[in-house]
Amino acid sequence: LAPYEQTARLCFDKYEMYQFLVKNQIRTARTCGSWPEFDRAYRAGEISFPVFVKPRTGSGSVGARRIDTPELLKQVMDQDEGLIVQELMTGQDLDADVYVDTISHQPVAIFSKRKLSTTIGGANKTISFKDERLFAFVKEALKAFRFNGPLDMDLFYQDGRYYLSEINPRFGGAYLHAYGAGVDFPAFIYHNVKEKTANTDHIGKYDEEIVMMMYDSVVIKKLDEIQSEMTTI
């Protein structure tokens, strides 16, 4: 189930991923890996403000932010050469949990959801939806990669088209939504790893408008009260 090393390295480096997507004609946000590259693209009218910056190899959206002026962008990129610059995507922020079968090497499950709210880089409120165009876009994009098992894909929907942002070759932090909607990756893993059999196609086999809400809370009670409630449950 572990990703191929070359694929894992590609997914970890967001700028290399961008170059790979462009090379393979997969729609993605315009990205620049340095201030000189951005300056050339900006002067050529290929990218405009506001823009979005984030670490080239970061995770959890640490350091990611919007920037509105060339002066501020130059300043932050001079301070941190590990940043990349992307065009600001203003469309819908989406996520897809994907399972690539380890026997057939084909995607057998795609669970798509809209992000309603995010925290520390991950979605904590999402709602499921289906779109055959999204399923087709994901399947076509995956032809360029070598994956095994669970994936987490970040996408945008803007101006009537889907764009691929990032791929994490692992379970996504919000995979619980897919599982709760009946998209059972552990069962797929069991079939592949234990039974050595390929999974059948489950793409789109879930209900729309299933909502997941994750939240933190604080409970302050006496120990005997908690124990009593647990016994009741």
Residue ranges and their predicted role:
Residues 57-59, 117-119, 170-173:
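A short, flexible beta-alpha/helix-coil linker loop
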Residues 65-146, 156-157, 161-163:
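Phosphate-binding site of ATP-dependent enzymes
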Residues 49, 92, 149-151:
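A generic structural signal for short beta-strands and their flanking turns/coil linkers
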Residues 8-90, 102-104, 132-135:
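Active-site nucleotide/adenylate-binding loops and adjacent lid/helix of ATP-dependent enzymes
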Residues 130-233:
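ATP-dependent carboxylate activation and anion-phosphoryl transfer catalytic cores
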Residues 1-9:
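Short, acidic/small-residue loops that bind anionic groups at enzyme active sites
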